[in-house]
């Protein structure tokens, strides 16, 4: 019977944290406050109280950060906001910026 030798090689792997992006909701004159709160609760998983606070901040300042995510997650959340807004014929928009 032949002998088998197993050699284990130790590898050091450095993992970098992924780059993060702020998702920013933009205010407009047509989207209702109730719809913005609904978006914040359903898409961004905010509590009703947090959603209301963020919505008022966006309303007063013209824009507001709703969350910080990796690129792919931020992109998909923005796409979902745009899809839901279009279905209701609202011009609500969101953008992302590197953190």
Swiss-Prot record:
<protein>
    <recommendedName>
        <fullName>ATP-dependent Clp protease adapter protein ClpS</fullName>
    </recommendedName>
</protein>
<comment type="subunit">
    <text>Binds to the N-terminal domain of the chaperone ClpA.</text>
</comment>
<comment type="function">
    <text>Involved in the modulation of the specificity of the ClpAP-mediated ATP-dependent protein degradation.</text>
</comment>
<dbReference type="Pfam" id="PF02617">
    <property type="entry name" value="ClpS"/>
</dbReference>
<dbReference type="InterPro" id="IPR003769">
    <property type="entry name" value="ClpS_core"/>
</dbReference>
<dbReference type="GO" id="GO:0030163">
    <property type="term" value="P:protein catabolic process"/>
</dbReference>
<dbReference type="InterPro" id="IPR022935">
    <property type="entry name" value="ClpS"/>
</dbReference>
<comment type="similarity">
    <text>Belongs to the ClpS family.</text>
</comment>
<dbReference type="GO" id="GO:0006508">
    <property type="term" value="P:proteolysis"/>
</dbReference>
<dbReference type="InterPro" id="IPR014719">
    <property type="entry name" value="Ribosomal_bL12_C/ClpS-like"/>
</dbReference>
């Amino acid at each position: 019977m032949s002998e088998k030798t197993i050699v284990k090689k130790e590898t050091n792997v450095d993992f970098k944290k992924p780059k993060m992006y702020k998702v920013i909701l933009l205010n407009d004159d047509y989207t209702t406050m109730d719809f913005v709160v609904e978006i914040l609760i359903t898409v961004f998983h905010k509590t009703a109280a947090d959603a209301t606070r963020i919505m008022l901040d966006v309303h007063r300042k013209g824009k507001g950060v709703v969350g910080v995510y990796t690129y792919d997650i931020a992109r998909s959340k923005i796409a979902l906001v745009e899809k839901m807004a279009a279905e209701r014929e609202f011009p609500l928009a969101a953008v992302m910026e590197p953190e």
